[in-house]
């Protein structure tokens, strides 16, 4: 629907299972809105998207328009219907990303939102990122 509403926006909309499917091509930006808790392999998935699908300098945004506490509580109520894992405190999640060599440009969480902005800074995979995803 979005691609029909904005046909000349210079944006390519892709709907995919980013854990299972390989995305074709590279992008300047990837937005993962309200999906991160549903990843079974969150660090591996993000590492693969950053290294395989972002141009150098490209950014990947993990975004939620609710707090971590609200999201975790909601997912507990519907755990029999959909897979979701608890969101970690944003600083802990960022530490997992930086531990394997990913570059985090900014991050924050409040009682209204949760986000992490990653950026691809190099052309080559670091050994730790490669080990995490391959």
What are these regions (language model features)?
Residues 1-20:
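Class I SAM-dependent methyltransferase SAM/SAH-binding core
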Residues 31-32:
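A conserved beta-strand element that flanks and buttresses the S-adenosyl-L-methionine
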Residues 38-50:
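A short, conserved alpha-helix within the catalytic core of class I
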Residues 57-65:
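Conserved beta-strand signature within the Rossmann-like core of class I S-adenosyl-L-methionine
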Residues 84-101, 107:
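Short alpha-helix
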Residues 99-134:
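Core SAM-dependent methyltransferase catalytic element
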């Amino acid at each position: 629907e979005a691609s029909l509403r904005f046909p000349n926006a210079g944006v390519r909309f892709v709907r995919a299972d980013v854990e299972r499917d390989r995305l074709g091509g590279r992008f300047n930006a990837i937005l993962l809105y309200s999906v991160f808790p549903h990843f079974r392999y969150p660090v591996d998935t993000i590492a693969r998207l950053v290294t395989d699908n972002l141009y150098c300098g490209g950014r990947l945004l993990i975004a939620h328009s609710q707090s971590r506490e609200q999201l975790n509580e909601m997912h507990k109520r519907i755990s029999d219907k959909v897979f979701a894992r608890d969101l970690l405190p944003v600083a802990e999640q960022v530490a997992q990303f930086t531990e394997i060599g990913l570059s985090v440009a900014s991050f924050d969480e409040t009682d209204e939102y949760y986000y992490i902005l990653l950026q691809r800074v190099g052309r080559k995979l670091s050994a730790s990122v490669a080990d995490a995803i391959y």
